[in-house]
């Protein structure tokens, strides 16, 4: 791997390229914080895909794209004479040192949970006077629910056992079924939200990432549906002309293939 000096040289090279692009490239010269925002979100999701696919080559590539965005934002900040990349790096370094007193101070912790609780306590001391105030409003709903639950748990508002949460899940499902039977769409939607929130909480307790779990299922469904499409082409049929029973038979074939010992599919 590269030495520390080589890493610093590579980062300096990126900074120099950013300066030159900002000065000479018509596209780069036009960019603002606002215009880059949606591109940054897209790059973040592409990194997430690479991680889920365990593709180290793509992870490296997508990390580079995100690093470019960080450098770009810092360049924009420096042009406004508000902050530069050194300020960004020093700010996060200061934060890490402050929030890790068990490493850089005298605080004693026994486990990971102690670290998380102390982290949230320090955030409150910093002026973030609401525990859930730091959860971004724009987070995807599943991720937001997980972060809400983690932050609440960080100050002791949590269940003792996973069995308690599972009972809560069953309770919420019963309430949802009752509203569905009444035909009340608004109340059904609310209760369905409660079911999802409880399931996400149960997953958290089991140390399952619910967003990752759902995305793996999404990918599995896509692969199996692609299999149906491929089979339909082999049979010279359109999906719209196939019966549900025909498609279900091919679906089962796909499941059998993906569960075989020699298969690497989901």
Language-model-detected regions and their locations in the chain:
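Flexible "arm" and connector segments at domain edges
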Residues: 1-62, 68-192, 196-266
